[in-house]
């Protein structure tokens, strides 16, 4: 089996990595209700956010083969990386998105991820993380092992 990393799609000579945070939000006041109209609006906003991400990718990466992994998913399971992106992009101030203590994005109809351009780029799951890999990751992120396991979902 292959052992892939998103770093495989970044050239040692230098590459550009795109970072993004997007949202589409219903302008009506938020409610915790579960009525059909509210759920329908939330669902529509989530689909429009995905469409916005597709449009952004086409505008930015015309003619390039790219992937758009989101933080917290199989190729990059550490949700805490969203905080770094929010800080770099000043996302809370610019578009009004926030993170919960568990790194969920508010509003929930938002996305945060990266764009990587590489001819062989593809989506994958990191799979099992070895002890040496966990140690290295925790050292690079300046976190303890327990925090690393929690952030990576192990």
Where would I find each of the regions flagged by the language model?
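Small-residue-enriched alpha-helical segments and adjacent helix-cap loops
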Residues: 1-132, 140-143, 151
